[in-house]
Design a protein with these regions (language model features):
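A compositional/biophysical signature of low hydrophobicity enriched in polar/charged and small residues
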Residues: 1-156
Length: 156
């Protein structure tokens, strides 16, 4: 992966709907060359998909929460299909610490969140944090360009 690939990835993370012509202008290549690079990045599993970013509140999902869960490893085969089928689960991560699972969920109301937590508790103890506000929304991975890498190396 070179600096052009990193620039293409950064641009696509900014807006996955940028036209090829715009991307090509930004990286000083032809549209077919950019298309070939994007296809290679997809084939290599670096670009894994394209998604619309939506406002959950505008869609009626006023409650975002993080739920920690203690899960016995023997329950994983039963738990993973269950949680995968729950449309309100935005993320499910295996984590270190007192709890083994961290879920990010969105619900229209605290009553629906409470019902979901009740179902989760068949798998283990939970701890829930409701989000009041988000200072840094989900964003892409920052890929330093060569100039930044050189600057960092010089400052060390």
């Amino acid at each position: 992966m070179d600096k052009i690939d990193r620039k293409i990835i950064s641009l696509l993370q900014e807006n996955a709907r940028y036209p090829l012509k715009y991307l090509a202008q930004k990286v000083f290549l032809s549209s077919p060359a950019v298309s070939t690079r994007i296809e290679r990045l997809e084939k290599n599993g670096i670009i894994t998909g394209y998604h619309a970013t939506v406002d959950p509140v505008a869609l009626g999902y006023h409650i975002t929460a993080f739920i920690n869960l203690t899960l016995d490893p023997k329950q994983k085969d039963e738990f993973y299909p269950y949680v995968t089928a729950c449309p309100n689960v935005l993320e499910c991560n295996c984590v270190t610490g007192l709890y083994s699972i961290m879920l990010k969920v969105a619900f229209p109301s605290t009553m629906e969140l409470d019902t979901f937590i009740g179902h989760l508790q068949q798998y283990g103890n939970t701890q829930t944090q409701i989000v009041f506000s988000t200072a840094v929304p989900p964003r892409g991975i920052h890929l330093p360009q060569e100039e930044e890498e050189e600057e960092t190396a010089q400052n060390q």
